[in-house]
């Protein structure tokens, strides 16, 4: 089982787009990726999730992020299900879906709940260096909110690029709106710097350890 901050394991996987190597397939293109598992093909909740992801896929791609699905079904099942979605819901799934029919990758990543034989609804956000930046789990009976995952990815990329933190419900936080949090001072000197920045109007603070500013 892996955790946030670790390197994504190097694996070769069979997908609806052919055999690919992770994380190299995406990182060598300078891209982040979202690996998400679903319990099974031809199931209602999973179908709504794939429909929802495809409807938002260009928003993820504008951020330099590619989705890739996974379940323990075989590749022919994925292909027929994708065809069904296209024929019946008028949406063409254009991202790869891993056929982890032996469950080896799912087991390695901790995607299979205790006592189960199919995956939970796991989400792994992996950056362009192959580092796992976020892991989210939903139970089989509850579908994911891709808008929240999109918010998570946007926030992670901003945090990485700007060295800031993002508050609850950003960019619609109840206290500071769409502003971002300046990391708390960790030394006396940094505390002085925060106070000086506040005096200059460069940042706002509730206290020296709780400062925020507009996103530049």
From Swiss-Prot:
Induction, as annotated: Up-regulated by exposure to oxygen (at protein level).
SUPFAM superfamilies per UniProt: Thioredoxin-like
Entries under Gene3D superfamilies matching the protein: Antioxidant, Horf6, Chain A, domain2 (3.30.1020.10), Glutaredoxin (3.40.30.10)
Compartments in which it is found: Cytoplasm
Temperature-related properties: Thermostable. Retains full activity after 20 minutes at 90 degrees Celsius and 75 % of its initial activity after 20 minutes at 100 degrees Celsius.
UniProt key word Oxidoreductase: yes
NCBIfam families (alphabetical): PRK13189.1
Subunit composition and interactions: Homodecamer. Pentamer of dimers that assemble into a ring structure.
Name of the protein in question: Peroxiredoxin
Native species: Pyrococcus horikoshii (strain ATCC 700860 / DSM 12428 / JCM 9974 / NBRC 100139 / OT-3)
């Amino acid at each position: 089982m892996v955790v946030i901050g670790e390197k994504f394991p190097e694996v070769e996987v069979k997908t609806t787009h052919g055999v690919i190597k992770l994380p190299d397939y995406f990182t060598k293109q300078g891209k982040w990726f979202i690996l998400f598992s679903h319990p099974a093909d031809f199931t209602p909740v999973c179908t709504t999730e794939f429909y929802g992801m495809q409807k938002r896929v260009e928003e993820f791609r504008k951020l330099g992020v590619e989705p890739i699905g996974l379940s323990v079904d075989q590749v022919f099942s994925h292909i027929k299900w994708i065809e069904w979605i296209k024929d019946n819901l008028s949406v063409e799934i254009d991202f790869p879906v891993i056929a982890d029919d032996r469950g080896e990758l799912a087991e390695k990543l901790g995607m299979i709940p205790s006592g189960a034989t199919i995956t939970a609804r796991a989400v792994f956000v992996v950056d362009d260096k192959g580092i796992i930046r976020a892991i989210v789990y939903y139970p089989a009976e509850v579908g994911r909110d891709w808008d929240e995952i999109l918010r998570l990815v946007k926030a992670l990329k901003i945090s990485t690029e700007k060295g800031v933190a993002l508050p609850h419900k950003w960019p619609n936080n109840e206290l500071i709106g769409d502003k971002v949090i300046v990391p708390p001072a960790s030394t006396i000197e940094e505390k002085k710097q925060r106070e000086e920045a506040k005096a200059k109007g460069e940042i706002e603070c509730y206290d020296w350890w709780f400062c925020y500013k507009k996103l530049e």
